[in-house]
């Protein structure tokens, strides 16, 4: 199945990750769940495995992705086929900063019709790596449409994780516990934009957040003051020839955690 593919998508691992998050939510009476780098919303708005929490918020710094989700949530969006010429035209307009189109349309073209889930990478052609016919854009549209009801259960907001105000988190959770799940760009991998992700700054932020909230991070590795509570070996395609490599995906938490986890 092809979801709305966002580089680093957690759809394949959702059936493992979400039960762990739900267990933490239940054991610690969390009233608020935040997916701080929600990407394709495959955790916060999964169609098969639901995050069970009273209030759910998803943050992502790509405004075109959030606009696309809002378009699906609040409007009827019919399928629009995008051929390679249209893709190149919209991509060039985007790169030129002309703002000819609405934000949701940049998201629609840039995510649903890009190869490998890289926003404005290259056009996803109508065949897979073995030459079999495949309409990637249509498949992604159908799966995005299937997420519509799940997306309605969460509030999705444009937010850079480094701009999250810890005092605002206090106001949001009030006197209750909060679980923050973070799936950051992996260290030493291609980024979504030209800005390099500041890994050191990120882990310092997680340390501060962990003083007030339950924070769970999806990563391959973490600093020594963090420990894994779950891990699974995954196989990834790394190019169009279907070459693969193997990684050990882990869920990390601060070593000296204060909350319940049996």
Can you describe what each PLM-predicted range is?
Residues 1-45:
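S-adenosyl-L-methionine
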Residues 1-7, 188-196:
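Glycine-rich phosphate-binding "P-loop"
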Residues 10-18, 166, 199-203:
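Short, well-ordered alpha-helical scaffold segments within catalytic/effector domains
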Residues 17-18, 33-47, 58-63, 111-115, ...:
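Conserved proline-anchored active-site loop of SAM-dependent methyltransferases
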Residues 22-25, 169-176:
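Short amphipathic alpha-helix with an adjacent loop that forms part of the alpha/beta core around
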Residues 28-31, 53-55, 175-177, 212:
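A general structural motif
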Residues 50, 54-163:
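Class I S-adenosyl-L-methionine-dependent methyltransferase module
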Residues 194-262:
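Long, positively charged, glycine-interspersed low-complexity recognition regions
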């Amino acid at each position: 199945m092809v979801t709305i593919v966002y580089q680093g998508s957690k759809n394949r691992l959702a059936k493992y990750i979400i039960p762990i998050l739900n267990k933490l939510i239940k054991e610690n009476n969390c009233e608020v769940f935040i997916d701080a780098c929600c990407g394709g919303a495959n955790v916060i708005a999964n169609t098969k495995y639901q995050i069970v929490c009273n209030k759910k918020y998803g943050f992502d710094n790509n405004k075109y992705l959030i606009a696309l989700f809002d378009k699906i949530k609040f409007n009827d969006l019919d399928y629009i086929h995008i051929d390679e010429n249209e893709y190149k035209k919209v991509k060039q307009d985007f790169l030129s900063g002309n703002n000819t189109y609405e934000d949701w349309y940049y998201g629609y073209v840039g995510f649903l019709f890009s190869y490998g889930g890289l926003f404005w990478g290259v056009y996803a052609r109508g065949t897979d790596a073995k030459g079999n016919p495949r309409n990637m854009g249509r498949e992604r549209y159908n799966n995005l449409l299937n997420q519509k009801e799940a997306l309605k259960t969460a509030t999705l907001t444009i937010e850079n994780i480094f701009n999250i105000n810890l005092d605002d988190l206090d106001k949001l959770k009030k006197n209750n516990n909060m679980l923050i799940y973070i799936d950051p760009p992996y260290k030493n991998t291609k980024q979504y934009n030209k800005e390099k992700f500041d890994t050191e700054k990120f882990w310092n932020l997680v340390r501060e957040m962990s003083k007030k909230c339950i924070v769970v991070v999806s990563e391959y590795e973490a600093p020594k003051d963090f420990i894994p509570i779950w891990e699974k070996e995954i196989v990834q395609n790394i190019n169009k020839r279907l070459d693969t490599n193997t990684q050990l995906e882990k869920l990390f938490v601060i070593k000296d955690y204060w909350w319940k986890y049996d």
